[in-house]
Amino acid sequence: RKEGKDFIVDGTQSEKVFLNSLSRPRKVMLLVPAGEPVDSTIKKFLPYLDKDDIIIDGGNSHYDDTERRYKYLKEKNIKFIGAGVSGGSKGARFGPSIMPGGDRDSYEIIKPIFESVSAKVKGEPCVTYLGNTSSGHYVKMIHNGIEYGIMQLISESYHILKNGLNKENIEIHNTFKKWNDGMLNSYLVEITRDVFKVKDEKSDNYLIDLILDKAKQKGTGKWTSQSAMDFGVSIPTIDSSVSMRIISSFKETRVKAQKLYSKKIISSTSSIKSDDIEKALIFSFVITFAQGLSQLKVVSEEKLYNLNFEKICKIWRGGCIIRAQLLEDFMQAYRKNSSLDNLIFDENISEIINK
């Protein structure tokens, strides 16, 4: 796919010159940090915008902020789209998964652009209109919550392989390679597989053994947990993953506690095989997606998003961080029953879980 290396981009030095250079209705996409930077950028742009121009917020904005901005701009006759974007650096180069929400007529105007730049799976763009106001950013928040959960599950699987089964890094690489060739085929398992082979250029030691076990977070996982509690939805895997990130950040406290308590060897892991861990991870992948999607189901009904869950799973299949082969199974489940309360109630999904 062309990356636009020969594409000419004109730079400007002022908001006025930039906005006057755009065709009408203007379509302005913001990719700035969530919070105040979004509001300040909108404030700077407003004097140079006309009726029915469209502002697109492509950052990880909180859904409450998106609703506030939508109402504020509507009063000024400016269209607003809150669009979740997933894909990282690869998504920027080869096409992301895009999750837009707002007015349908506004989306129809930007639809050709989004479909052109988004990732493609089987020739189909990984973007679709999701629903009103904050639906796009809410779906992206849930996407990130699921991502948190899966990353924690992968981390714990690695820990058992490394410290429970005493496997070497190359063995773990081969194990993850086998997993990724099967039902666990996914972006996160794929990149984790590759990490185990990487060596540090300075010491020639494996990089995985040198990485500080201290994770940071941008807040979207926390927002997912907070919102689930507000709406009375249980998402224990995602909640636990957020807590584990917080625990990991207290490195000094953990080291201090480690000195006070002796490390005991647990012999019960001797009966566990990597195939057992694979089965547990498949089960946990399904459950994590089920938790996130069940939260979306409840909130969609509360906020009248009218989300199409088959389409959500469809656009998550490419360009995004939680891309996974299992999404094909989830799509089929929602195709059979669009009002499915929880994935675990689908017959085919229950067969996967029972294995």
Where are the model-predicted features located?
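C-terminal substrate-binding/catalytic lobe of Rossmann-fold NAD(P)-dependent oxidoreductases
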Residues: 121-133, 166-266, 308-355
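A general alpha-helix detector
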Residues: 141, 156, 223-224, 276-277, ...
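Membrane-water interface at loop-to-transmembrane-helix junctions
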Residues: 271-282
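Rossmann-fold dinucleotide-binding core
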Residues: 38-43, 56, 62-174, 182-210, ...
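Conserved N-terminal Rossmann-fold NAD(P) cofactor-binding segment
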Residues: 1-27, 31-49, 68-77, 259
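Hydrophobic beta-strand scaffold residues
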Residues: 11, 80-81, 235
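Glycine-centered, small-residue-biased loops immediately flanking beta-strands
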Residues: 53
